[in-house]
């Protein structure tokens, strides 16, 4: 029975990674009014992995999406890769702490919005550390954090819908 659950778990995580990667590649093709603003829909799969299997699964989905996505888009080890990795690590860590603490107290919307805020904040810190003068930080924060928060709320709403709609399935794989 354990082997069957492990196979189901691995295949489910594989599907989440594939979906996250597909959304990541799709988002890269969408023109944006600001270069750093993306919908962040690929983070939906990280959140579902976190809520279904815990922090290790969420971290795995995020890392595979960021690394494989960067390899496919030709940006591996570029500044954009560093920003994506820093944001992904920060958001996954914050969301994992919220989930581990007692995620029933937090809605997927709150977890996602907080993770998106951490994602944007980490990206601004990396930008400030490597590319910008520290005086640019106050100017840049609202331009990054407000779209991040909006994206996080949208992702949280979608996660809630997916979790409610597929509740019967998630019980079987968790």
Placement of each model-derived feature along the sequence:
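Hydrophobic transmembrane alpha-helices
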Residues: 2-49
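Helix-boundary and loop/linker segments of multi-pass membrane transporters
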Residues: 2-9, 36-37, 73, 101-105, ...
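Hydrophobic alpha-helical transmembrane segments
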Residues: 10-15, 44, 48, 56-63, ...
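Alpha-helical transmembrane segments in multi-pass membrane proteins
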Residues: 16-23, 50, 61, 65, ...
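Interfacial aromatic-anchored transmembrane helix boundaries in multi-pass membrane proteins
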Residues: 23-39, 64-95, 131, 136, ...
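Helix-loop interface residues and adjacent transmembrane-helix termini in multi-pass membrane transporters
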Residues: 29, 52, 102-105
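Generic transmembrane alpha-helix motif of multi-pass integral membrane proteins
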Residues: 41-56, 94-99
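Membrane-embedded alpha-helical hairpins and interfacial helices in multi-pass inner-membrane proteins
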Residues: 76-78, 82, 97, 101-174
């Amino acid at each position: 029975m354990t082997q069957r659950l492990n196979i189901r778990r691995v295949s489910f995580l594989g599907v989440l990674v594939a979906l996250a990667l597909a959304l990541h590649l799709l988002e890269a093709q969408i023109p944006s009014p600001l270069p750093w603003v993306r919908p962040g829909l690929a983070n939906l799969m990280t959140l579902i992995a976190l809520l279904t299997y815990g922090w290790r699964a969420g971290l795995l989905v995020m890392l595979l999406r960021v690394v494989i996505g960067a390899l496919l888009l030709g940006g591996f080890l570029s500044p954009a890769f560093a920003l994506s990795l820093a944001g992904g690590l920060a958001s996954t860590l914050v969301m994992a702490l919220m989930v581990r603490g007692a995620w029933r107290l937090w809605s997927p919307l709150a977890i996602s919005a907080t993770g998106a805020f951490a994602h944007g904040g980490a990206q601004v810190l990396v930008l400030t550390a490597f590319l910008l003068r520290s005086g640019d930080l106050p100017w840049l924060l609202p331009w990054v954090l407000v779209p991040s928060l909006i994206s996080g709320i949208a992702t949280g709403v979608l996660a809630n819908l997916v979790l409610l709609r597929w509740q019967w399935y998630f019980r079987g794989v968790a």
